């Protein structure tokens, strides 16, 4: 068959999309077309910050039906989402409790309990995953301690992409790359860790053994009656984004830039040394036995909140105004946990500047300048940490995802990091999702083969570092700004 049509459902923490890919195996051309885009946002339900998963499912089905109604024969479907969040089901497959978001404050104070009762080094030795207060391990502990009446009703716990695949197919699956984000998967066995799971109060029977990307979960029956296979892709959106990152060689790092920024490198081995633990490095699972050695950075969430609070709709105009301002007048640590979900983001940023005896950003452009400069400096700091960890410097950084469209931030990143930045592709998570589907359909051999297709079909923009820039001169001075309460233990 010359042409393949695959559908990627890509859900981020702020938006979702259903994308149609058309692959010409003869000419190795790959095109994407957006079928349906929709908003994903938090809502308050019974005092909890929750996801409207019924609305998300409705939009997923709407997007799939739109493709089918065009008369296109879909070869496969794949779903990727953000990590750590889950849905509980009873024996009949009905939901138990609420789909609570990782940004909810129910996990406050939970992680320190684990550090005392299990031990930080022991948790890291078992999982190899960074300590973030909203990891699934702490969410489940919060659930079983705060709402014990729910646990007796639970028969299954599905992570978000597995839940939506279940809703389409009726079949349950626990995909490996996303499962590793829970901090509950043993890094040596690739299965759920008995000790860590027992501490949460959840039952191991709620989970099936994690499966690696590339298996067919089941079929979705389209309105026309055709059975379409739903493939378990690398269902953590960052895992999919990394698959589509055209990394040139082992000296290339990546930055998946969106609501979250995830910076790291690809490795055939995990890094679980004392040095890695001290730096709060994570070893998330990838496809083909690869590890995503990375760190989470709060990312454009700060900007998204400021845009919403101040009703800013013209982002290009804001960026143009921001670029005209002098650099590094206002600096914060974007990974300070005060920025996870404050009532008022711009007020929180202003307070952080005030508390460190800096000028206070007031205008929209000043707030954006603060965010962009601070992110770029944090990127440089973390890239240095990652290079020290592996014992080799990086020569190139690939920025993928929606954030790679921000030319100002890309240049600031290049200047601060002191290396060449390659920006693109924008829809990296979608492309990585499609890549696994094409491999499952035997159209491509492996990830390296797929990256060649991406490189041939998607243009990248190059940013050359300017060592004389203002932000480059501030790199060494940024360290004191990081002495804050970070997203770690």
UniProtKB/Swiss-Prot annotation:
Organism classification: Bacteria, Pseudomonadati, Pseudomonadota, Gammaproteobacteria, Enterobacterales
Annotated protein name in UniProt: Rhamnulokinase
Cysteine disulfide links: 68-222, 353-370, 413-417
GO biological process: glycerol metabolic process; rhamnose catabolic process
The keyword Kinase belongs to this UniProt entry's keyword annotation: yes
UniProt record similarity statement: Belongs to the rhamnulokinase family.
GO molecular function terms listed in the Swiss-Prot or TrEMBL record: ATP binding; glycerol kinase activity; rhamnulokinase activity
Keywords: ATP-binding, Disulfide bond, Kinase, Magnesium, Nucleotide-binding, Rhamnose metabolism, Transferase
Its EC number(s): 2.7.1.5
Keyword Oxidoreductase: no
Listed cofactors: Mg(2+)
């Amino acid at each position: 068959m010359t042409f393949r049509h695959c559908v990627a459902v890509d859900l981020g923490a702020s938006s979702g999309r259903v994308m149609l890919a058309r692959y010409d195996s003869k000419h190795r051309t790959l095109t994407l077309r957006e079928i349906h885009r929709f908003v994903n946002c938090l809502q308050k339900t019974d005092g909890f910050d929750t996801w409207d998963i019924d609305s998300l499912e409705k939009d997923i089905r709407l997007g799939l039906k739109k493709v089918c109604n065009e008369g296109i024969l879909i070869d496969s479907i794949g779903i990727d989402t953000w990590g750590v969040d889950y849905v509980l089901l009873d024996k009949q497959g009905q939901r138990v409790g609420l789909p609570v978001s990782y940004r909810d404050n129910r996990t406050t104070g939970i992680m320190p309990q684990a550090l005392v009762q299990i031990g930080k080094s022991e948790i890291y030795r078992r999982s190899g995953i960074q300590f973030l207060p909203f990891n699934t391990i702490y969410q489940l502990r919060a659930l079983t301690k705060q709402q014990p009446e729910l646990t007796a009703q639970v028969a299954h716990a599905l992570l978000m992409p597995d839940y939506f695949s279940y809703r389409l197919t009726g079949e349950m699956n626990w995909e490996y790359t996303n499962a590793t984000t829970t901090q509950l998967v043993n890094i040596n066995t690739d299965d759920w860790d008995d000790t860590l799971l027992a501490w949460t109060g959840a039952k191991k029977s709620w989970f099936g053994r994690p499966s690696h990307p590339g298996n067919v979960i089941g079929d979705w029956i389209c309105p026309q009656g055709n059975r379409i296979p739903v493939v378990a892709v690398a269902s953590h959106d960052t895992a999919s984004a990394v698959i589509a990152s055209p990394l040139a060689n082992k000296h290339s790092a990546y930055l998946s830039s969106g609501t979250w920024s995830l910076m790291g490198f690809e490795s055939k081995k995990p890094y679980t040394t004392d040095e890695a633990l001290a730096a709060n490095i994570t070893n998330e699972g990838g496809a083909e036995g690869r590890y995503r050695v990375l760190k989470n950075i709060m990312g454009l969430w700060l900007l998204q909140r400021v845009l919403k609070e101040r009703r800013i709709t013209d982002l290009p105009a804001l960026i143009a105004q921001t670029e005209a301002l002098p650099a590094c007048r206002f600096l914060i640590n974007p990974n300070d946990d005060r920025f996870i979900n404050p009532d008022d983001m711009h007020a929180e940023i202003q307070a952080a500047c005030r508390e460190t005896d800096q000028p206070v950003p007031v205008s929209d452009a000043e707030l954006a300048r603060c965010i962009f400069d601070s992110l770029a400096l944090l990127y440089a700091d973390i890239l240095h940490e990652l290079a020290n960890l592996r014992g080799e410097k990086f020569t190139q950084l690939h920025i993928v995802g929606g954030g790679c469209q921000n030319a100002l931030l890309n240049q600031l990143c290049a200047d601060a990091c002191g290396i060449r930045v390659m920006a693109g592709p924008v829809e990296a998570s979608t492309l990585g999702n499609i890549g696994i589907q094409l491999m499952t359909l035997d159209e491509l051999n492996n990830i390296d083969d797929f990256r060649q297709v991406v490189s041939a079909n998607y243009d990248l923009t190059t940013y050359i570092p300017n060592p004389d820039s203002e932000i480059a001169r501030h790199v060494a001075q940024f360290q004191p700004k990081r002495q804050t309460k970070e997203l770690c233990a």
